[in-house]
Amino acid sequence: MIGNETLAEGLGAVLQYCYEREEIFMVKILFVCHGNICRSPMGEYVLKHMVAQAGVGERFEIDSAAVSREEIGEPVYPPARREMAKHGVSCEGHKARQVTMADYHHFDRIYYMDRSNARYLSRMLPQDPEKIRPLLPRDVADPWYTGDFRQTWEDITEGCRKIMEEFA
């Protein structure tokens, strides 16, 4: 379980208020990392889990993508999948894909994991600091190099909680 029920309840209350007044909106979020097999799918599935726990999953569209083409079509890297499973988060059916200009136009927010991702994105998409932002004020630990999937889980969870706070 991810916890932080207060955030989940707050977000649920705000969205229920809007729903009752027919002020329906959908928040569209895209997570981006280098290969879309570790960090960005962790962001995608952790946030999906959080909004589902809050009972507001239908108000969010959440996806993930890569800046590179290296892992296209690959599932979540097994150690990342195992770390998510420890916390009750499933990532079944995920296949890595590359970010596109259509994603830029479709998503409200695009969260990248580190400065390298930001550099790639700046060459691929228009520069838009309101839309394209770091998930955290620091780089999210890259478990591909560190091997520390627990630390990456903690970083991703911290970032997803901040997203929940922003939309609550």
Annotate each language-model stretch with its function:
Residues 1-25:
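N-terminal amphipathic/basic-hydrophobic helices that include classical n-h-c signal peptides
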Residues 5, 93, 150, 154:
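Conserved phosphate-coordination/catalytic loops
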Residues 3, 10-14, 30, 38, ...:
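Generic secretory/membrane-interface signal
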Residues 19, 25-105, 165-168:
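Conserved active-site segments centered on acidic
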Residues 8, 44, 77, 106, ...:
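Surface-exposed beta-strand edges and their flanking turn/coil or helix-capping segments
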